[in-house]
Amino acid sequence: MGFLTKIVDGNKREIKRLSKQADKVISLEEEMSILTDEEIRNKTKAFQERLQAEEDVSKQDKILEEILPEAFALVREGAKRVFNMTPYPVQIMGGIAIHNGDISEMRTGEGKTLTATMPTYLNALAGRGVHVITVNEYLASSQSEEMAELYNFLGLSVGLNLNSLSTEQKREAYNADITYSTNNELGFDYLRDNMVNYSEERVMRPLHFAIIDEVDSILIDEARTPLIISGEAEKSTSLYTQANVFAKMLKAEDDYNYDEKTKSVQLTDQGADKAERMFKLDNLYDLKNVDIITHINTALRANYTLQRDVDYMVVDGEVLIVDQFTGRTMPGRRFSEGLHQAIEAKEGVQIQNESKTMASITFQNYFRMYNKLAGMTGTAKTEEEEFRNIYNMTVTQIPTNRPVQREDRPDLIFISQKGKFDAVVEDVVEKHKKGQPILLGTVAVETSEYISQLLKKRGVRHDVLNAKNHEREAEIVSTAGQKGAVTIATNMAGRGTDIKLGEGVEELGGLAVIGTERHESRRIDDQLRGRSGRQGDRGESRFYLSLQDELMVRFGSERLQKMMGRLGMDDSTPIESKMVSRAVESAQKRVEGNNFDARKRILEYDEVLRKQREIIYGERNNIIDSESSSELVITMIRSTLDRAISYYVNEELEEIDYAPFINFVEDVFLHEGEVKEDEIKGKDREDIFDTVWAKIEKAYEAQKANIPDQFNEFERMILLRSIDGRWTDHIDTMDQLRQGIHLRSYGQQNPLRDYQNEGHQLFDTMMVNIEEDVSKYILKSIITVDDDIERDKAKEYQGQHVSAEDGKEKVKPQPVVKDNHIGRNDPCPCGSGKKYKNCCGK
């Protein structure tokens, strides 16, 4: 309890501090009101000049603190003149919390959009760009259009970054003082910027300050979603079909175990025996069978943990993911690690080819790259530990402008779902008779449709808002607070949209929110409740539960069922028990804890690739931004030669076989016969290096003489292609390592430590391969020039669920590389995808 008291006291102290700062802002109201419009814009210019004259970010931060009261007061005056709205003291407090890099928790209807204008304006003055991030393009467009009036009045520019924009339009949007965008588009633009070949193809500036609307949705609910830019991999889909056939043959408990609490499924020993017989294996868990085990486990998940119309829907032969937090389908998105293909096999639709990852990043790692990160939402306090541990953000609960008048009634618990739904319908009919608007919240599409059928039988007119008819969302939400309105919504009672009460509804008790089941996250329940009682309106909320609900089943409702039976309670009699409500909340906390642990575990694994990604992207950017790459190329060639001598020339042996070393030199650096054994025989390693290096230098200068004006361009192209090719292969290898690493725990090994160690070794090997590739292609290519060849564009790699059109840019002439020698480990030119030595070079 001491810890909780500290949190509560801490919030009170913070509110007191913010309140004092807000008073300073309000005290400047009169001073600002006498300024002309032009004088207001001149103030903005003066702030900008003062800040932008200082290049040191920490010194800029001090200036921002000094000018905060005046800048916030200026925005208040601007809002008054442009919108005829003056931000309340609580909105100023919320704005200061956001400026401090924290999360401002503000209830629904408290005006988060207007709150964000003050810290956005203040931080945009530094000229480094502020990103205002929303969950979808509709909100980004509407907010940017609305708020641009205010920012333009104050003298700042506003950009809107959409998926459909060209490269030039995107760059323009990012160069504005304030940029509105979705989280997806930002992540993909970052990845694409790190796949370009020329600096002028980049669209983003360095990541400075981001304000995330609905921050819990993006940083918690979407944290595990990787953004992936991918190309198609040439892998057969037949194993998905075989694994699906196998999974459907299995019997629960005999062949596999399903854990309700963790939603995990795994084969029993008997199931493993069946797998060995079907796939003709000696030992299913042998490491060489990782691919088969992975496909079997994926088929088990698809068949026994994911439900159609709950986790996904099938529309026109396509599997669409349903977002469990919003109830919306997510067209274009696919489950990763082969799970989407496994569901396609399960549903008998066409199995799409697996894709090969070219670049990827999680939201956790993307957003941690900003110098400063802040957010706002109506529900964040339950996840404060995660925000603090992973993002170093504190949650500040901002008081409401008017007292909350919503009545949150105790849960009603029934024995069966039938009893629960009958009671829900009776409650709806009763309230509907007097005209009170009702919002019914469900956790699944099928539940919303079941309740809809029950209400139709009772003659109650209503709207259904779920993944199947989400296109009417704005229209349905806009009328949900009108007299007599009944709305059934699946986890999606419109984040970012307010339900406003119609005329005469206040007298009827306001909006009644009825939850038909507890969600596994308390935040989603709080969001549903928060639809009612906005800005001091009257309202009420109540949850109806049954012992057959998924959350209750997962966390043991047998004891309660027996207790209710002993009390002689029938299906129509609910209990209203604080003990049961506490048990439900305890179950939710356990699920939230499990989910937090899973996100932390993913972050630990992702940390390995994050560090490697930073090295590779840093190397690429250095190549792109430097005038010449010759120094780097020569360093790579020398390093490759030095390694080869250390490996092949063992000075401790009496007789050294120089043939393997000469073969390597001919394969990578020089042509056949250019190095003879008698030139290096009997020499020490240093002398051998000098002898061979002299010949390599000559070959390098000869290549340079072929295209003196374009040799820099040639080197840059070879470097980027070598890095990109090896990096995409490395991502694929790391993905395979990660999928199979859990098997190590059976051998009493630490999977994470093994992943870190082996990932490090794989990265070192990749860097060696890059240096060898660069050496070979620089020294052994026949070079001609073709002015008509266009640059490689990042758009060649199609985003997994987002892609952007590139602008039409003037193309620099590029060298054409014709390799006159095929190494044994090179891809075979016949196009089989195999190595040359395993194909035509046998």
Curated annotation (Swiss-Prot):
Matches recorded under Pfam families: P-loop_SecA, SEC-C, SecA_DEAD, SecA_PP_bind, SecA_SW
Catalysed reaction equations from the record: ATP + H2O + cellular proteinSide 1 = ADP + phosphate + cellular proteinSide 2
The EC number(s) this enzyme carries: 7.4.2.8
Note describing how the cofactor binds: May bind 1 zinc ion per subunit.
Main location: membrane
Name by which UniProt lists this protein: Protein translocase subunit SecA
Other comments on record: Complements temperature-sensitive (ts) secA mutants in B.subtilis but does not function as well complementing ts mutants in E.coli.
GO CC list: cell envelope Sec protein transport complex; cytosol; plasma membrane
Source taxon at top rank: Bacteria
GO terms for MF: ATP binding; metal ion binding; protein-exporting ATPase activity
Location of the region described as Disordered in the Swiss-Prot/TrEMBL record: 798-827
GO biological processes: intracellular protein transmembrane transport; protein import; protein targeting; protein transport by the Sec complex
Compositional bias ranges of the Basic and acidic residues kind: 798-824
Residues at which Zn(2+) binds: C828, C830, C839, C840
Residues holding ATP: Q91, G109, E110, G111, K112, T113, D498
Compartments where located: Cell membrane; Cytoplasm
Subunit structure: Monomer and homodimer. Part of the essential Sec protein translocation apparatus which comprises SecA, SecYEG and auxiliary proteins SecDF. Other proteins may also be involved.
